[in-house]
């Protein structure tokens, strides 16, 4: 047989297999696959005869090899005969009874009654969880028996109509009757320490406690409101610092007339120092405050304020907040505008009073007015600078400016004038702010001052 010149052949290789060879190879391959899944020795219908061939006892067919028999078992004829045989056997076989369910034997014992119990309602002070504590007494419990419990739904019991708002906690122990407690149908907290049971064998008491889960987060605890007039305890310190004072509910209304707002009271701790003089409330718009009465000192000398160095003998610092005037030029009083250019000032020593202002009574000193007075036209205020002091002279207090040249210091025993008040000539009392002092009176025409005693009256001038 020529294998070299067949169509489809390749030089140096075998020829193309015939159809018979391909079928044989296919059957062998299927037999190997069938033997891997089917154990032919366990087939009840497989039989090998004395001729060495194989027979099918169900279909009565003859097969030359195992592959042929395995192919037969997968065919339609063999499958049909298997179904027919199974139906026949099922018809002829007797009906077998269904397997019985396992029955649980109910213990039968003589019940002696209900046990004693005690229920305690509890509430956790920290978390606010509600809990129930049950104490059941079983003094005559059977030997080797431990009480048992379980939760029962309202739909499992047959004693009351079912209500989903409630559930039942059952307690059982021989020979006592089973008792049940009706509790709210809420979720039980099974966390560690929230659900526990204990059986005391000595006292024959059974304890059970469970907590309900929190439905809402606990609200922060609030201090109870005490009776009126009783102050609450101060709040705890945070980081070692006291809490801030509460802010005012509403700001004070603005003053009428467009006046500036009064300063807010300080919120911090009060300064450690001597209390100052009492301050009067601001006057209403258009109303002038009464002038305070100033009594002369007993000895004529006042001690200096705390924190202020006394000046050297013969040197007095000027009043705080007062700029030294230029030599020969007096600044106008507060509230009086400087004259316009081209208008001659009044005669020296004669000052007309302001409209609506009456001259003060003798012996009445006006209150000091703080502030800086405007200068006359063409006069420049002194620059805010500090001049070196002479040896042995203490520097002035903060806010005080040195005096200009030509201004003589006050003699010892005379106090500096108040802020914003210019010194007056001897024997003349200062007037109210905005009013120029009157013309000095002759020595014999002015009344004696209170500080001048009977022996301090100056002698009359000599007559010609």
From Swiss-Prot:
Component of the 17S U2 SnRNP complex of the spliceosome, a large ribonucleoprotein complex that removes introns from transcribed pre-mRNAs. The 17S U2 SnRNP complex (1) directly participates in early spliceosome assembly and (2) mediates recognition of the intron branch site during pre-mRNA splicing by promoting the selection of the pre-mRNA branch-site adenosine, the nucleophile for the first step of splicing. This is Splicing factor 3A subunit 2. InterPro entries: Matrin/U1-C_Znf_C2H2 (IPR000690), Matrin/U1-like-C_Znf_C2H2 (IPR003604), SF3A2 (IPR052092), SF3A2_dom (IPR031781), Znf_C2H2_sf (IPR036236), Znf_C2H2_type (IPR013087). It comes from the Eukaryota. Residues 370-392 have a biased composition (Low complexity). SMART domains: CactinC_cactus, ZnF_U1. Its main location: nucleus. The lineage of its organism: Eukaryota, Metazoa, Chordata, Craniata, Vertebrata. Belongs to the SF3A2 family. The modification N-acetylmethionine is found at residue 1. SUPFAM superfamilies: beta-beta-alpha zinc fingers. One of its GO terms (cellular component) is U2-type precatalytic spliceosome. GO terms for biological process: mRNA 3'-splice site recognition; mRNA processing; mRNA splicing, via spliceosome; positive regulation of neuron projection development; spliceosomal complex assembly; U2-type prespliceosome assembly. GO terms for molecular function: RNA binding; zinc ion binding. Keywords: Acetylation, Metal-binding, mRNA processing, mRNA splicing, Nucleus, Phosphoprotein, Repeat, Spliceosome, Zinc, Zinc-finger. Component of the 17S U2 SnRNP complex, a ribonucleoprotein complex that contains small nuclear RNA (snRNA) U2 and a number of specific proteins. Part of the SF3A subcomplex of the 17S U2 SnRNP complex which is composed of three subunits; SF3A3/SAP61, SF3A2/SAP62 and SF3A1/SAP114. SF3A associates with the splicing factor SF3B and a 12S RNA unit to form the mature 17S U2 small nuclear ribonucleoprotein complex (17S U2 snRNP). Identified in the spliceosome 'E' complex, a precursor of the spliceosome 'A' complex. Identified in the spliceosome 'A' and 'B' complexes. The modification Phosphoserine is found at residue 153. The modification N6-acetyllysine is found at residue 10. Residues 217-295, 303-323, 331-369, 435-464 have a biased composition (Pro residues). Residues 1-27, 217-464 are annotated as: Disordered. It is found in: Nucleus. The keyword Zinc applies. It holds the Pfam family SF3A2. A zinc finger (Matrin-type) spans 54-84.
């Amino acid at each position: 047989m020529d294998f070299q010149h067949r169509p489809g052949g390749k030089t140096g290789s075998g020829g193309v297999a015939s159809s018979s060879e391909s079928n044989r190879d296919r059957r062998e391959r299927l037999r190997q696959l069938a033997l891997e899944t089917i154990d032919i020795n366990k087939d009840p219908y497989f039989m090998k005869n004395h001729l060495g061939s194989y027979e099918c006892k169900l279909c009565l067919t003859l097969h030359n090899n195992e592959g042929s028999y395995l192919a037969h078992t997968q065919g339609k004829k063999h499958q049909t005969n298997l179904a027919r045989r199974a139906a026949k056997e099922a018809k002829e076989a007797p009906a077998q009874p269904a397997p019985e369910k396992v029955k649980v034997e109910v213990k039968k014992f003589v019940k002696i009654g209900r046990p004693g119990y005690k229920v305690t309602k509890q509430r956790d002070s920290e978390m606010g969880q509600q809990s129930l504590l049950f104490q059941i007494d079983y003094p005559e419990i059977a030997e080797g028996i431990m009480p048992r419990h379980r939760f029962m739904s309202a739909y499992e019991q047959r004693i009351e109509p079912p209500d989903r708002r409630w559930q039942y906690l059952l307690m059982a122990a021989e020979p006592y009757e089973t008792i049940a407690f009706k509790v709210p149908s809420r979720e039980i907290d099974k966390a560690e320490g929230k659900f526990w049971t204990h059986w005391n064998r000595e006292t024959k008491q059974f304890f059970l406690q469970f907590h309900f889960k929190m439905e809402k987060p606990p609200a922060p605890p609030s201090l109870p409101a005490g009776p009126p007039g009783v102050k609450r305890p101060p709040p705890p310190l945070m980081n070692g610092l006291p809490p801030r004072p509460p802010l005012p509910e509403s700001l004070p209304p603005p003053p009428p007339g467009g006046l500036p707002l009064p300063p807010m009271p300080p919120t911090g701790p009060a300064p450690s120092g001597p209390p100052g003089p009492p301050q009067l409330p601001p006057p209403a718009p258009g109303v002038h405050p009464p002038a305070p009465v100033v009594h002369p000192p007993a000895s004529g000398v006042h001690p200096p304020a705390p924190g202020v160095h006394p000046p050297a003998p013969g040197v007095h610092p000027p009043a705080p907040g007062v700029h030294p005037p230029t030599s020969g030029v007096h600044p106008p009083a507060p509230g009086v505008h400087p004259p316009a250019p081209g208008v001659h000032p009044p005669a020296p020593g004669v000052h007309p009073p302001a409209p609506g202002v009456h001259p003060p009574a003798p012996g009445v000193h006006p209150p000091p007015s703080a502030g800086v007075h405007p200068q006359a036209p063409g006069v420049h205020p002194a620059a805010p600078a500090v001049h070196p002091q002479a040896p042995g002279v203490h520097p002035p207090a903060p806010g005080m400016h040195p005096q200009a040249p030509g201004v003589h210091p006050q003699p010892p025993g005379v106090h500096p004038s108040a802020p914003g008040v210019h010194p007056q000539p001897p024997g003349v009392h200062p007037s109210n702010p905005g009013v120029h002092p009157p013309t000095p009176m002759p020595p014999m025409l002015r009344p004696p001052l209170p500080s001048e005693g009977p022996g301090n009256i100056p002698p009359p001038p000599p007559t010609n």
